[in-house]
Each structure stands twice: as C-alpha cells, then as structure tokens.
Swiss-Prot record:
Role description: Involved in iron-sulfur cluster biogenesis. Binds a 4Fe-4S cluster, can transfer this cluster to apoproteins, and thereby intervenes in the maturation of Fe/S proteins. Could also act as a scaffold/chaperone for damaged Fe/S proteins.
Molecular functions per Gene Ontology: 4 iron, 4 sulfur cluster binding; iron ion binding
Pfam family, one: Fe-S_biosyn
Protein name: Fe/S biogenesis protein NfuA
Species in which this protein is naturally found: Shewanella piezotolerans (strain WP3 / JCM 13877)
Binding site for [4Fe-4S] cluster: C149, C152
Gene: nfuA
Length: 192
C-alpha cells in the first residue's frame, strides 16, 4: 500500500524517539477522491488507533491508515531527501484525488484517471488543468482547458506534443487523437 524509503524510515524512528512509548505515525488523506485531496502524516498515540485502521509494519515503527484513506493511498511513497537547501519529507500519493481504475474499466474512466493523476498535476504548476468532455465514436478525446491554460500561447504545443502523445501512447488502438474545444481567451489568468 505505502512504500517508505529507508531514509524516511530512519527519519520517523528519530522523530518517534522523542514521543511517548507506543506512538506510531498516521498517514491520511483529507477529502479523498476529490480535487481538493490533501495527504498528510502525523503522530498517532496508542489511544488514537481505531479498530478499522490498517497497521503497516516498518523498521522500528508502525504506520496507521484509516479505512477511508486506505484505497486512496495505494502506490503512495514517502521519502526523506537531503540536498544543498536542506532536508524534506515528501509524500506522493498518485491515487489521492481519484482511485486507481482497473485495466478493464471503461475507456472514459481510464482516461479520466490519467488526467487527474498524471496530467493535471503537471498543468497545475502553471495554474492550469484539463477536463475530459467526451470521447467521440471515432476515438477522439475531447478536452477543455481551464485555469492558466485557457488563453496560454503554448496551449497547442501542450495539447499535441504533451497530452495527445501521452494519451495515444497509453491507449493505443482505443484513442485516435485529442481535440481542444476551449474558447480560449487570453487574460491575466493565462500562463503566457
């Protein structure tokens, strides 16, 4: 369910050494399955363990995951990285905003999952996002850009060289292309 790197495990053991005996960590998702999903890690004293928690054993500590968060933490990773600027704990949970869908799920669900878990997080760095409007009978994914992507001068490059290439590579034989139906209006909200 959750992979915690050796350096992150050592970091947690160090942090927990200053806590009361029996304290573990809790990994959770606030508003799981929504665009506002936020992941977090906190201390979990023994009296905060719930009967329906999943307990994951690591080297020197356990991690508790509540029942509601568990499916959204599939394939999550926690790492502790140190560089010239200092050290940082990172938690990546690709399924926090949307549960992973099976390979035999309908095409629209699989594309929506890729958009929410892979494409939109990349576009978010520019304040943008895309939404799947429909998939046409001839296999065209009809998309609408929003936020900073609406009116951006680079939207055609993003669409053809980025999004279309990624989706066609992931869904060969099912998708034939992508189409942008956004009425682009350049403004203060636009990235470039």
């Amino acid at each position: 369910m959750i992979t915690i790197s050796e350096t992150a495990q050592a970091h947690f053991v160090n942090l927990l050494s200053d806590q009361p005996e029996g304290t573990h960590i809790r990994v959770f998702v606030i508003s799981p399955g929504t665009a506002q999903a936020e992941c977090g890690v906190s201390y979990c004293p023994p009296d905060a363990v719930e009967a329906d928690d999943t307990e994951l054993e690591f080297n020197g500590f356990n991690a508790m995951v509540d029942e509601k968060s568990a499916p959204f933490l599939e394939e999550a990773t926690i790492d502790f990285v140190t560089d010239q600027l200092g050290s940082q704990l990172t938690l990546k949970a690709p399924n926090a905003k949307m549960r992973k869908v099976s390979g035999d799920a309908p095409l629209v669900e699989r594309i929506e999952y890729v958009i929410q878990s892979e494409i939109n997080p990349q576009l978010a760095s520019h304040g943008g996002n895309i939404m799947l409007v429909e998939i046409t009978e001839d296999g065209i994914a009809v998309l609408q850009f929003g936020g900073g992507c609406n009116g951006c001068s680079m939207v055609d490059v993003t669409l053809k060289d980025g999004i279309e290439k990624q989706l066609l590579d992931m869904f060969p034989g099912e998708l034939t292309g992508v189409k942008d139906v956004t009425e682009h209006q350049h403004g203060d909200h636009s990235y470039q």
